[in-house]
């Protein structure tokens, strides 16, 4: 009988990716270009995966700014081109799943979480970042929009071959003082459904002191392997509590609590501490699910 937990007992992974990058910054723009090659090899008990990929990336970004004594506004369009020469065969997934898109992930060369699967489509990515600061009423608003367009075949999502990615919208808004709201939407290219979203409230004193409560929704549930789960086709609806708090210059504590809104119980709890200095970083974490 089929057992989804009967995985390969031994997997040997080997990956090498040399690259060369050039960047230039101007008064109101920046340009960068990079070329590289990636070789990945997986050896398992039943098969071997050996893939080589050559790639090129070019990115151009404009900076439009408006300043006054009481406010600051910026609008930064970004255009990125990615082309690849890679093996187009589809191997069984070992380490990878299709990641949910946010603004930063949209500009990545690969949209899979591991190196054994690769998004091999040439594409153009358009993005816009808008920021508005006001010293008069302590307002801070960040808005990001992005979308990718495939030059050849699209990628397979939700049973369809898409020629463009979902539209990604993100925002972060200061409510008052150190309190913020943030959110993200991943909207279908036909604008008729939402693939994923999150909405949260956050207290942030600096990068090392943060508490965030957010709701998470994912219409699709792309697991790492093609396992048969009874709820595989159902969306994910969860609440998540994230904390990280520095107690000194070297020590930080952190934690994460995940609650499933359908099961009405906590399904993932992790906590720990981290020590870091100029030369090293070490931590200890406990996880229960």
Feature roles, as predicted:
Residues 1-274, 278-288:
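Outer-membrane beta-barrel translocator/pore domains, especially the C-terminal barrels
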């Amino acid at each position: 009988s089929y057992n989804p937990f009967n995985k390969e007992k031994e997997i040997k992974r080997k990956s090498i990716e040399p690259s060369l990058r050039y960047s230039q910054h101007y008064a109101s723009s920046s340009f960068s270009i990079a070329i590289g090659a990636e070789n990945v090899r997986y050896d398992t008990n039943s098969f071997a995966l050996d893939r080589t990929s050559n790639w090129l990336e070019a990115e151009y970004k404009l900076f439009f700014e408006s300043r006054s004594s009481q406010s600051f506004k910026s609008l930064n369009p970004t255009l990125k081109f990615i082309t690849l020469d890679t093996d187009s065969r589809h191997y069984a997934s070992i380490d990878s799943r299709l990641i949910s898109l946010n603004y930063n992930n949209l500009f990545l060369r690969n949209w899979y979480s591991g190196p054994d699967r690769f998004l091999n489509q040439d594409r153009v990515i358009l993005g816009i970042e808008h920021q508005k600061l006001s010293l008069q009423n302590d307002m801070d608003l960040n808005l990001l929009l992005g979308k990718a367009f495939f030059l050849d075949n699209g990628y397979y999502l939700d049973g369809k071959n898409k020629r463009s990615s979902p539209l990604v919208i993100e925002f972060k808004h200061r409510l008052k003082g150190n309190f913020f709201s943030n959110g993200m939407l991943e909207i279908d290219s036909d604008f008729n459904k939402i693939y994923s979203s999150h909405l949260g409230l956050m207290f942030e004193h600096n990068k090392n002191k943060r508490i965030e409560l957010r709701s998470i929704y994912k219409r699709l549930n792309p697991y790492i392997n093609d396992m048969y789960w009874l709820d595989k086709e159902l969306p994910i609806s969860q609440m998540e509590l994230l904390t990280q708090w520095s107690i000194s210059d070297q020590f930080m504590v952190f934690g994460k609590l995940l609650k499933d809104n359908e099961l009405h119980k906590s399904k993932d709890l992790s906590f720990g501490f981290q020590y870091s200095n100029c030369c090293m970083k070490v931590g200890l974490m406990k996880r229960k699910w």
